[in-house]
Amino acid sequence: MLNLFRESDPIDIMGPDERNIEVLRYSSGADSTLGILSENGSMGREFLAYTLEDEFREEKVSAETRIPEGTYNVKLRTEGGFHNRYSQKFGVPWHKGMLHVQDVPGFEYILIHTGNTDENTAGCLLVADSSTQNITKNGFIGASVAAYKRLYSSLAQWIVDGNKLTITYIDYD
C-alpha cells in the first residue's frame, strides 16, 4: 500500500478561502512520471485523479522536463492555443480558462489538461482516471477527459469565486 505521507510532510492549515491540491509523484520511468492527485478534506485525504508528467532531469530540457517539487499558485489562463481549443471543445461558459500553474522557476505556461502519454505533456500535468506502470514500458493514463471534466468544474469555479488555489508537487519517486 502506498503511504501518502512522510514524517517530514507539513500539515497545512488552510483558510476558508484557500484550497491546496497535491501531486504525489510515485514512479519515474525513462520518459514519464506517474503520480496521484489528491486533496485533504474533512474526511481525510481524497483521491482526485492519476497524473502523468515528463520525466525528472537534472538540467531542464524545454518541453521534456517535469517541474520542480514545490507549492505553486494556480490561476486561470484565458489566452493561447489550449484555451481556444478547450473553449471550442468544452464550450463557453463551462470552460473559463486553462488551469495554469504559476511562478515555476525556469518554466512557463504549465497547464493542467487532458492527455495520455508523455507526448502530450510538454512539461504540463495530465490528469486521468486510470494509470499503467512506466517501468517496463512508457507510462499511460486513460479516461483523461472524464477526469478533467470532473475536476475542472470545481477547481475553476473556486478560482472564479475569488478564492486561492495552490498545487503542491511532492517527490516520492
Q: Residues of each region from the PLM?
A:
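Cell wall/extracellular polymer interaction/catalysis modules
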Residues: L2-L165, I170-D173
